[in-house]
């Protein structure tokens, strides 16, 4: 049989959940309303920053008032929502290129290219187009497509970097260096590379980041970086606010705040979790374990570090899932692992229906799956065929 009974049940549940998420996400106007008025989604923040950079005012991308005015240029009307641009100035070059298009074509280009890169990385990890289709079904992928966020870029860059690490370490380092566009996703990369003795990749990553910073300073000027630094301080203050919608933060900090814990105590717990993630990553990458498990562990631990992560960032968990599948193709499938992967995706999907930090549960589930696999070694596998 192509599928066991358990696999068929998993597929049926997955399809049903997928349909529910589609109805939840797309059951209303998207980008363009029935009256022809454009809607603002997260991508407008990137477009507006690129519009300002292209007009010769890159530092204005980090000025809330000027950035909000640029929203109007893209939408053709004022928007009640303001989507900031909290990314390093070297991201402005890509944003400016996108802003040469109108808002909707730029959005379509951004989503199409990021989804293609994500699927390409997934296929490279799993080793088959069918595996890439599975990766496309992750609920976090839908969120990124719907609002034009950058979670697919994060997953693609991390995936490309890890899949190339053993074969082409310098190219891998370039991909991992590019991940610095979102520092909270890249923080554990140096830990893993140092622990694993991946010195060529580490050097390539460091040189990539240095080149991006130098080029940005030369083109956009020091004032743009100063404006970026000032905005980071404002974001830090926002996280500590007592009236923050903490359900959107898919982190331990967000979960504890949602349960009523004061900001300072929740942040202390988050720092402890980050320290544990750093230690776990170092241990995993120092051990002579299968590379696929090391990569899966890094992807899962990555989302335990920062207090500032949202549902679209959970696309990074698909890198962990892809490497777990890659490992299982060689070592054999394990029923606990399969249930863990399904449970993690259900937890991510639950965010769309509840606006609560169930993404933390998904991260912890996959972390447990990785640690268990490392402890067990190579158990007898189930008779479930690999994706082909």
Tell where the protein language model's regions lie, with residue ranges.
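Membrane-embedded alpha-helical segments of transport systems
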Residues: 181-184, 211-215, 338-340
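Primarily membrane-embedded glycan-assembly and transfer machineries that use lipid-linked glycans
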Residues: 1-171, 193-330, 378-388
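Aromatic-enriched
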Residues: 325-388
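Membrane-interface alpha helices of multi-pass inner-membrane proteins
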Residues: 170-194, 298-305, 344-350
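General helical secondary-structure elements
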Residues: 5, 20, 178, 335, ...
